[in-house]
Amino acid sequence: MIVKVFCKSDDFKYTTKKYVTMKTTKINKVLIALDYDPSARKVAEVGYQMAQSMGAEVFLVHVVENLVAYSLSYLNMGPLQLDTVVELKDASQQFLDRTKLHLGNESIQTEVKEGDFADCIIETANELDIDIIVMGSLSKRWLENIVLGSVSERVMKQTTIPMFIVPTKKRD
């Protein structure tokens, strides 16, 4: 596949061309990582359209991070009960199933993972031999980004798999 990339001439020191041609390998598998944010629909749609245009398989993944964090311990109610954990995973699977239905393709594969967001996304991508990871990214204020970090940023720093980031909000 040949991809033309628009660039400013000062971005590429060794070319005066407006477009640079790059050779890429065929993209066969696309992993779309989703959370419960309302912007997940946009991320799923953009990732799916991209995968469809390349004739690639689509995998949707949702990560349930640190189940204890979902507990109501701040209300002194203790950790989650097993039933609640199962319900949380079931709700996550239903979320992915609804997304799959919305995209209208039964061949989309879904998976709910438990653990650290970034680690699970990378592990899943490696297990499935994914060619590109699609994620959303909230555009936070710089201080929030420094303090809170970003899952997409962590994934980007820890993987060599190409990523496609869908901006989901404008900067404040």
Show where each model-derived region lies:
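Structural beta-alpha unit
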Residues: 3-6, 14-25, 100-133, 170-172
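Short, hinge-like loop/turn segments at secondary-structure boundaries
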Residues: 75-79, 127-128, 151-152
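Glycine-rich, Arg-bearing micro-motifs that act as flexible, cationic patches
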Residues: 132-154, 172
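Small/aliphatic-rich secondary-structure junction motif
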Residues: 23-78
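Intrinsically disordered or low-complexity boundary/linker segments at protein termini
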Residues: 1-42, 157-172
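A short acidic, glycine-rich active-site loop
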Residues: 79-91
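General small-molecule cofactor/ligand-binding pocket signal
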Residues: 59-61, 109-113, 164
